[in-house]
UniProtKB/Swiss-Prot annotation:
SMART domains: Sm. Residues 2-75 form the Sm domain. It comes from the Eukaryota. GO terms for molecular function: U6 snRNA binding. Keywords: mRNA processing, mRNA splicing, Nucleus, Ribonucleoprotein, RNA-binding, Spliceosome. It is found in: Nucleus. CDD domains: LSm4. It holds the Pfam family LSM. Residues 122-147 have a biased composition (Gly residues). This is Probable U6 snRNA-associated Sm-like protein LSm4. PANTHER family: SMALL NUCLEAR RIBONUCLEOPROTEIN SM (PTHR23338). Binds specifically to the 3'-terminal U-tract of U6 snRNA. Signal peptide: none annotated.
């Protein structure tokens, strides 16, 4: 479970935030962003020593000042249910389009330089611009352009 998905789910729930400087903030999470900046409402701020309290209607806390967050257990359970549900909805890896050809060895030869004489070459020559047996003798190049 990722911290940001936990915070997104915790919107509207009460939480405790402790900052690196020791202050704590108790309030209801309104919003959070990708930098873990959070917006709380109905906040009670407690000083580092725990002897001073402030009540604020709302506050904004910068994400890099946060030491830890205490989130209700119901939110954690909800996030775990959502992640397990989304994992069960996914296809297993390697199923569907885009995971290789799947028919290697069933068709003769491919295209390009790596093709040999006997495995799918039309008139020999091994591909565009290559001489060789049955090719254009001493003429270099692919037969296009000047020269």
């Amino acid at each position: 479970m990722l911290p940001l998905s936990l915070l997104k789910t915790a919107q509207g729930h009460p939480m405790l935030v402790e900052l690196k400087n020791g202050e704590t903030y108790n309030g209801h999470l309104v919003n959070c962003d990708t930098w873990m900046n959070i917006h709380l409402r109905e906040v009670i701020c407690t000083s580092k020593d725990g002897d001073k309290f402030w009540r604020m209607p709302e506050c904004y806390i910068r994400g890099n000042t946060i030491k830890y967050l205490r989130v209700p257990d119901e939110v954690i359970d909800k996030v775990q249910e959502e992640t397990s549900k989304s994992r069960s909805d996914r296809r297993p890896p390697g199923v569907g389009r885009g995971r290789g050809r799947g028919d290697i060895g069933t068709k003769p030869g491919g295209r390009g330089i790596g093709r040999g004489q006997d495995d799918g070459g039309s008139k020999g020559g091994g591909g565009r611009g290559r001489g060789g047996i049955g090719g254009k003798g001493g003429i270099k190049g692919g037969g296009r352009g000047r020269g």
